């Protein structure tokens, strides 16, 4: 009887908390198995899995949640999934920090960003939601399925609105018939132009040619 009463009280508390969040000026609505509220309601911790939904419809799924209402910063760990439905983007990782005031997401561990035609993987990712910019660091890989191109580098920056990719460190671009390697690459996805800088090497497997130069510009459409 005591256990039933305890469960009822816990469920009632969670329901009351969700209703309060939904009807007030909260940054997130939490739907979590266990919730802990500390520091006069300014620190919200969640355990055993759940979701946090922001006003714009973005949903974060994770095992653990730590939200500071004063700073509007949400930290999540374990099986993290961030869904930005407005930009059609899904980000997964081991851990993530969401700076709500700046609309920026930082991930660490097994990080991956996916949309309709592109995938970016790396050890860590930065996502600037307002400017639609991705930065992938350490073992970064960017795949463009539409143009059948894969880019590898130490760091990759993807300007989604401009459809441009910039890389630094051990950079390599690969498609069906060509490979370009250099210290850094620039890829204009709209015009299909590659620029390789410093120790650039371009291989054309179809024509069986290799070009070496300090800088190489490859106009793929031509």
Which residue stretches match the model-derived regions?
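Bacterial N-terminal signal peptides that target proteins for export
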Residues: 1-9
